[in-house]
Amino acid sequence: MATTRLKTLYQETIVPKLTQQFQYTNVHQVPKLVKITVNRGLGEAAQNAKSLEASLTEIATITGQKPVVTRAKKAIAGFKIRQGMPVGIMVTLRGERMYAFFDRLISLSLPRIRDFRGISPKSFDGRGNYTLGVREQLIFPEIEYDSIDQIRGLDISIITTAKNDEEGRALLKEFGMPFRDQ
């Protein structure tokens, strides 16, 4: 299988640039992408089997991988949830699929967001990982407007080997992540 554009960019351009910027002594110290998780909480749709199926097909279409149904660990009466009920779906992307999805995300999907001025640079977790919330699935070119029954959002978490937010931000910026200026 041919390597993706971003993986080649990482190996040929980003590694030397970050090595020089942070004075790494070894190429293995340079932060890299580990995985991308795409998650959707079902909320009220947990009781509706048709809504669950629609979410499963949408996430599978967006990521190119079959999602896993996450289930409630314990019952919560306030949320009308019993143990074992479906509460969300998620996909973990690694390797070539991860790079292909990330490429589509930053070059095609994010610019399609209405009134897009860049993404917030404040959504790092302190350890170099970034989480992005998407309000509607229509920003992905794989989803057709006529095929959806309801607008639903999803969360995208980008997990890196960076030690802190500064390294993580530098890595994602080099990949072409459109951060908003502060």
Curated annotation (Swiss-Prot):
Taxonomic superkingdom: Bacteria
Any one cellular-component term (Gene Ontology): ribosome
Q: Name one GO biological process term.
A: translation
Alphabetically list the UniProt keywords: Ribonucleoprotein, Ribosomal protein, RNA-binding, rRNA-binding, tRNA-binding
InterPro entries noted in UniProt: Ribosomal_uL5, Ribosomal_uL5_bac-type, Ribosomal_uL5_C, Ribosomal_uL5_CS, Ribosomal_uL5_dom_sf, Ribosomal_uL5_N
| Gene Ontology molecular-function annotations | rRNA binding; structural constituent of ribosome; tRNA binding
Q: Which NCBIfam families match?
A: PRK00010.1
- Write out the function statement from the record: This is one of the proteins that bind and probably mediate the attachment of the 5S RNA into the large ribosomal subunit, where it forms part of the central protuberance. In the 70S ribosome it contacts protein S13 of the 30S subunit (bridge B1b), connecting the 2 subunits; this bridge is implicated in subunit movement. Contacts the P site tRNA; the 5S rRNA and some of its associated proteins might help stabilize positioning of ribosome-bound tRNAs.
| Family label | Belongs to the universal ribosomal protein uL5 family.
- Assembly behavior: Part of the 50S ribosomal subunit; part of the 5S rRNA/L5/L18/L25 subcomplex. Contacts the 5S rRNA and the P site tRNA. Forms a bridge to the 30S subunit in the 70S ribosome.
- What is the protein's given name? Large ribosomal subunit protein uL5
